[in-house]
């Protein structure tokens, strides 16, 4: 009986204790929730008294005592601060707050969690020092505080956490020296301290970390010789000490002492001496980066490292300009996994061995530029079929380009400048349709510029200056719409500058100086709105300087040594970014402007124009004569003529006004008829119309197998027009749907008079009766073989048969965004009447063979100058102007009129979707948490957390330049999505910003991996 009472008493006490402690955990978590930002708190909606504590989201309890042991709240978009109440969860073993938006400091109360083994607060916005209380958590195995804003030094108390297996402080603002107490962490396997501001030498106590296999110290300010302690860590697999201030020589036996290395990055330091030959004995080695040091001597053979994928030795002083310097390349043919080889900017001599053609078929990057290599390019270079980047510039290579080079169809970057290459530029270059940069400048190429270069539709930079080329500038080059840089200077080109130069609206640099070009400068040159550098000096151009006032961003202009005449245009004075203007040695005359760049005689050269006058004193020109008396006398006689002319003009204007009023009245009488019947004025401008029967045959009876898409007003079919043997897209309208006829008319009216390379081309229309006597309407467009942008952004939602075989690269997305922005700018600004698309979204952006974007579906488009209030409300009643949920501007939801600002909003959403991979209607979003706020909350530190993962593929090194470019893209998107229409960017600015971003990205991609 006594035993029974004792057991009952103990059970009662246990229940009371359990009830008390369970409530403690509950209150601690509710207090934690109260400190979470209100807009993020919905994620924790289950945290209330209606749910059992152990069923709360992210909460795991112990089996016996039902105390909270695990709190897993990673990647839930939570914000606010971390409540000190977290310290009351005394049974907590694991706390995961990874990748949220928590700010403030880490509460000292975390130190009360004596059972804690796993703590992850990485990728937040935490600041301040690491709290000293944390070091009471003596059971900690994993401590991750990476990618925050933590400051102060690495505390010596860290050494008391002797059970630590992983310590990650990457990407903070830690300062000072490493404490010697780190040596106490003898169980440590991973230590990440990269991207901080740590300094000093690595303490010798690190040698005690005998279990460590990953040590990352990259991008700090560490100094001294290669840390001697590291030679003792034979278990190391991943070692990164790059981009510090280390110096001195490496031990010859490094490869013996560290035999298990998979990755070794020591680039960007000040190491001297030779590369230890023992490194080639590490059979497990996959990545070796010793670039950007002061290493000398020969390069050892790496034939015994079969798994080597990356070898970076560039930017050193390796080699001795001898014929044997390149012998090591032959041994690399054994490295069948090699993807990246960078050995440029060294002192390597000798002929380029033919063995490079036998390197790994997986090779993507080959950089031998900036050395002393001679000989010719091996004929079998075409064996490297996966090569994307080939850099052989600044050498002494000679001879013609081998024909097998034309087999490198994946090549994106070909740099051969400053060699002694000869022969003609081969036509097979045009087969390399993926090329983005082609640099053949400063060689001995001769003959004409091949027209096949026009096939390289992805080309961003074309450098063929300083050769011996002749002939005219091929018109085909003017079709490369994405071209940013075009340099043909220093040749013997003849003929005129093509009128089509204005089609290169993305052009930033045009350099055609020192040729034999002639004729007048085309007015279309003023259409190159993104021009920054214009060099046309040393030619035979004549006539007036054309209207270039659209080039408001230009920085350098050189028109010297030509035969130009007329006056100096005043608009040069208004160019705020103009830094250099050379108009010397022409036949210019008249008054020199005195404002803007003309206020400084050192930035403007106008010598050799004998009839110029005026200007500031620095030009030392003769003063301009005032009006001669004879001119004054003539003035009165001209006055009568002016008065008569003005009178006649006013009379004509009055007559024209009366005629216009009459015409408007007549058109209003015809309004109802025109609403329901396509008039000849609408359709006759299109090609010859096609019959219902022809379309039925072309689509196999409108078969479902021919269907390629559907929308609110109809279905799109792929069709083969037998008469023209041409594949087209046929949009058949659902005439039962209210508003279908208005959609048909709007699309015809919108597209009949507009032409732009990024608009889908409307070929013709069909207005007929089907075989059952029903009204039939269809629009026939050119067919886009690569489908819609929507398919590429969300392939998981597409049937496998239509699914793209790969994902879009970052550069391809930028190009598509520029295409779409360009067409909006055209519709909004450059059409005779502004047009608002009103339904811009990924499914309405179609892609052709080259992934050039074409905007489609103008069923909701509005010709804004023809807009009137009555028609707007008629359209609104049929849901016409509302566009698509998620993409439509907020003002449309409250009766706002269609506008170009509404299109800008839709474009902003489109841009965010393109780079996050998330639709605005994603289930993640709701209430005030939208795609906009999701993006805004990640700027600027957490960009990579929201970027579409498919962008971050193996071919893209995610470094600071890439992150910077992505940040700028998102900022443009957010500025387009401003709530107030008046605060949104103009499309012209959007185009300019995106092109500038693309240039930044392109410049970053020109440098090899670091």
Swiss-Prot record:
Residues 702-1002 form the Protein kinase domain. It catalyses: L-seryl-[protein] + ATP = O-phospho-L-seryl-[protein] + ADP + H(+); L-threonyl-[protein] + ATP = O-phospho-L-threonyl-[protein] + ADP + H(+). GO terms for cellular component: plasma membrane. The modification Phosphothreonine is found at residue 699. The chain crosses the membrane at residues 646-666. Keywords: ATP-binding, Cell membrane, Glycoprotein, Kinase, Leucine-rich repeat, Membrane, Nucleotide-binding, Phosphoprotein, Receptor, Repeat, Serine/threonine-protein kinase, Signal, Transferase, Transmembrane, Transmembrane helix. It is a single-pass type I membrane protein. Glycans are attached at residues 48, 88, 136, 184, 221, 232, 281, 294, 334, 358, 431, 455, 470, 582, 600. Its EC number is 2.7.11.1. One of its GO terms (molecular function) is protein serine/threonine kinase activity. Residues 20-645 are extracellular. The modification Phosphotyrosine is found at residues 781, 826, 887. It is found in: Cell membrane. The active site is at residue 839. LRR repeats lie at residues 89-113, 114-137, 139-161, 162-185, 186-209, 211-233, 234-258, 259-282, 283-307, 310-333, 335-359, 361-384, 385-408, 410-432, 433-455, 457-480, 481-504, 505-528, 530-551, 552-574, 575-600. It comes from the Eukaryota. ATP binds at residues 708-716, 731. PROSITE patterns: PROTEIN_KINASE_ATP, PROTEIN_KINASE_DOM, PROTEIN_KINASE_ST. Residues 667-1010 are cytoplasmic. Residues 1-19 form the signal peptide. Belongs to the protein kinase superfamily. Ser/Thr protein kinase family. This is Probable LRR receptor-like serine/threonine-protein kinase At3g47570.
């Amino acid at each position: 009986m006594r035993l029974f009472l004792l057991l009952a008493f103990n059970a009662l006490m246990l229940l009371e204790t359990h009830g008390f402690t369970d409530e403690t955990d509950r209150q601690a978590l509710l207090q934690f929730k109260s400190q979470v930002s209100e807009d993020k708190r919905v994620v924790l909606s289950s945290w209330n008294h209606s749910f059992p504590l152990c069923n709360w989201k992210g909460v795991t309890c112990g089996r016996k005592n039902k105390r909270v042991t695990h709190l897993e709240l990673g990647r839930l978009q939570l914000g606010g601060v971390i409540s000190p109440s977290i310290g009351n969860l005394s049974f907590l073993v694991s706390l995961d707050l990874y990748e949220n938006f928590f700010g403030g400091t880490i509460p000292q109360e975390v130190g009360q969690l004596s059972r804690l083994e796993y703590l992850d607060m990485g990728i937040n916005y935490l600041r301040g020092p690491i709290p000293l209380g944390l070091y009471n958590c003596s059971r900690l195995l994993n401590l991750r505080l990476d990618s925050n804003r933590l400051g102060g030094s690495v505390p010596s108390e860290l050494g008391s956490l002797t059970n630590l297996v992983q310590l990650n402080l990457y990407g903070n603002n830690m300062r000072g020296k490493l404490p010697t107490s780190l040596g106490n962490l003898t169980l440590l396997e991973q230590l990440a301290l990269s991207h901080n501001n740590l300094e000093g030498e690595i303490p010798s106590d690190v040698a005690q970390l005998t279990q460590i296999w990953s040590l990352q110290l990259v991008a700090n300010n560490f100094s001294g010789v290669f840390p001697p302690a590291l030679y003792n860590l034979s278990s190391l697999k991943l070692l990164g000490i790059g981009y510090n201030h280390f110096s001195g020589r490496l031990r010859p036996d490094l490869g013996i002492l560290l035999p298990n290395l998979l990755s070794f990055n020591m680039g960007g330091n000040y190491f001297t001496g030779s590369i230890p030959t023992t490194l080639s004995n590490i059979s497990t080695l996959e990545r070796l980066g010793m670039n950007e040091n002061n290493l000398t001597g020969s390069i050892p053979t790496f034939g015994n490292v079969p798994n080597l994928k990356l070898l970076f030795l560039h930017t050193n002083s390796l080699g001795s300009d001898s014929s044997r310097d390149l012998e090591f390349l032959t041994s690399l043919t054994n490295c069948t996994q090699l993807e990246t080889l960078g050995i440029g900017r060294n002192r390597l001599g000798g002929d380029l061995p033919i063995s490079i053609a036998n390197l790994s078929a997986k090779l993507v990057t080959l950089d031998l530029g900036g050395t002393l290599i001679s000989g010719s390019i091996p004929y079998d270079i075409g064996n490297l079929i996966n090569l994307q980047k080939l850099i052989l510039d600044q050498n002494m290579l000679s001879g013609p380009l081998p024909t097998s080079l034309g087999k490198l169809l994946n090549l994106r970057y070909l740099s051969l400048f400053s060699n002694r290459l000869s022969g003609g530029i081969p036509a097979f270059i045009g087969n390399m349709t993926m090329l983005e940069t082609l640099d053949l400048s400063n060689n001995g190429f001769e003959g004409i510029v091949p027209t096949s270069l026009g096939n390289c539709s992805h080309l961003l930079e074309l450098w063929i200056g300083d050769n011996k080329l002749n002939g005219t500038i091929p018109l085909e080059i003017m079709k490369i719409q994405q071209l940013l840089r075009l340099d043909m200077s220093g040749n013997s080109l003849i003929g005129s500058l093509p009128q089509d130069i204005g089609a290169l609206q993305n052009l930033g640099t045009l350099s055609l100086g020192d040729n034999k070009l002639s004729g007048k400068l085309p007015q279309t040159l003023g259409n190159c709105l993104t021009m920054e550098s214009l060099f046309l000096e040393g030619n035979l151009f004549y006539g007036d300087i054309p209207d270039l006032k659209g080039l408001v961003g230009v920085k350098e202009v050189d028109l010297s040594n030509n035969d130009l005449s007329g006056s100096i245009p005043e608009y040069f004075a208004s160019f705020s970014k103009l830094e250099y203007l050379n108009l010397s040695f022409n036949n210019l005359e008249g008054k020199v402007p005195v404002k803007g760049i003309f206020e400084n005689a050192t930035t403007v050269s106008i010598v050799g124009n004998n009839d110029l006058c005026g200007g500031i004193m620095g030009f030392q020109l003769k003063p301009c004569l005032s009006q001669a008396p004879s001119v004054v006398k003539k003035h009165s006689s001209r006055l009568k003529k002016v008065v008569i002319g003005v009178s006649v003009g006013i009379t004509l204007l009055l007559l024209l006004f009366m005629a216009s009023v009459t015409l408007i009245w007549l058109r209003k009488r015809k309004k109802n008829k025109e609403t329901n019947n396509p008039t000849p004025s609408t359709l006759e401008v299109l090609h010859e119309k096609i019959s219902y029967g022809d379309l039925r045959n072309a689509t196999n009876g409108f078969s479902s197998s021919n269907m390629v898409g559907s929308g609110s007003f109809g279905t799109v079919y792929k069709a083969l027009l037998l008469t023209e043997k041409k594949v087209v897209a046929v949009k058949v309208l659902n005439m039962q749907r209210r508003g279908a006829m208005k959609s048909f008319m709007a699309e015809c009216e919108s597209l009949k008079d507009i032409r732009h390379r990024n608009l889908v081309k409307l070929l013709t229309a069909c207005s007929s009766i089907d075989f059952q006597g029903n009204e039939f309407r269809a629009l026939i467009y050119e067919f886009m073989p690569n489908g819609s942008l929507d398919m590429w952004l969300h392939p998981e939602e597409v049937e496998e048969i239509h699914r793209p075989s790969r994902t879009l690269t970052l550069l391809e997305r930028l190009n598509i965004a520029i295409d779409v922005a360009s067409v909006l700018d055209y519709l909004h600004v450059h059409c005779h009447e502004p047009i608002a698309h009103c339904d811009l979204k990924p499914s309405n952006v179609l892609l052709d063979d080259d992934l050039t974007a074409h905007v489609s579906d103008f069923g909701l488009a509005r010709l804004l100058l023809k807009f009137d209030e009555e028609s707007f409300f008629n359209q609104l009643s049929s849901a016409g102007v509302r566009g698509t949920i998620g993409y439509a501007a907020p003002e449309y939801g409250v009766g706002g009129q269609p506008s170009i600002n509404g299109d800008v909003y839709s474009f902003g959403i489109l841009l965010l979707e393109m780079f996050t991979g998330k639709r605005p209607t994603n289930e993640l979003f709701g209430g005030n948490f939208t795609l906009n706020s999701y993006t805004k909350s990640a700027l600027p530190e957490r960009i990579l957390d929201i970027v579409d993962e498919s962008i971050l593929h193996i071919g893209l090194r995610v470094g600071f330049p890439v992150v910077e470019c992505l940040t700028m893209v998102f900022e443009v998107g957010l500025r387009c999505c401003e709530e107030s229409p008046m605060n949104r960017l103009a499309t012209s600015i959007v185009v300019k910003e995106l092109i500038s971003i693309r240039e930044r990205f392109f410049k970053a991609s020109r440098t090899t991996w670091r």
